[in-house]
Amino acid sequence: MTALSVNDYLRQHIRTVPDWPAPGVQFRDITPLLQNPKVFRVLIDAFVHRYMDRALRPDVVAGLDARGFILGAVVAYELNVGFVPIRKKGKLPFTTVEETYELEYGSATVELHADAVQPGDRVLLIDDLIATGGTMMAGKKLLEKLGATVMEGAAIVDLPELGGSARLRASGLPLYTLVDFSGH
């Protein structure tokens, strides 16, 4: 499959749920990508093939709560590197570092175990979707607090009209996404 056909193939398996969780929202549901083993393999392989390259190979994969865990753990396994979860506040049992970020109405906090990465580790930060970019930016800051370098952010879906991918790139974070839903 070519890169273009992989993107189109994956797009065909992303369900759009209108007016969820609120009127006017077009929710991009990735669960159909996970339900079919052939489609799931194509999805995971799209990430693994990119990061097998020596220049892009991470030391660690970090996944953002919660769908980033699904992708990140499998990609880390396939690359034979460690996986670390970045969780919502209060979900990790050991000493943590935390980062608070702004939401449209309020704020949220994510945490990482203080020993999850080592200074100098090259980290791939992965999630299912980039909307406003707040969660991924908070994850990047957490990893950098511990001395790691976030070499790239990755996601299945980019919603560029919400500005997150532009903000992340402007912060210096390279991004790799598989399906762009601009103008949809």
UniProtKB/Swiss-Prot annotation:
Protein known as: Adenine phosphoribosyltransferase
Record flagged with keyword Glycosyltransferase: yes
Pathway annotation: Purine metabolism; AMP biosynthesis via salvage pathway; AMP from adenine: step 1/1
NCBIfam families: apt (TIGR01090), PRK02304.1-3 (NF002634), PRK02304.1-5 (NF002636)
UniProt EC number: 2.4.2.7
Protein origin, superkingdom: Bacteria
Catalysed reactions, semicolon-separated: AMP + diphosphate = 5-phospho-alpha-D-ribose 1-diphosphate + adenine
Quaternary organization: Homodimer.
Annotated PANTHER family: ADENINE PHOSPHORIBOSYLTRANSFERASE
Encoding gene (name): apt
GO BP of this protein: adenine salvage; AMP salvage; purine ribonucleoside salvage
GO molecular function: adenine binding; adenine phosphoribosyltransferase activity; AMP binding
Record flagged with keyword Membrane: no
One Pfam family per UniProt: Pribosyltran
Keywords of the record: Cytoplasm, Glycosyltransferase, Purine salvage, Transferase
Main location: cytoplasm
Lineage: Bacteria, Pseudomonadati, Pseudomonadota, Betaproteobacteria, Burkholderiales
An annotated GO cellular component: cytoplasm
Cellular location(s): Cytoplasm
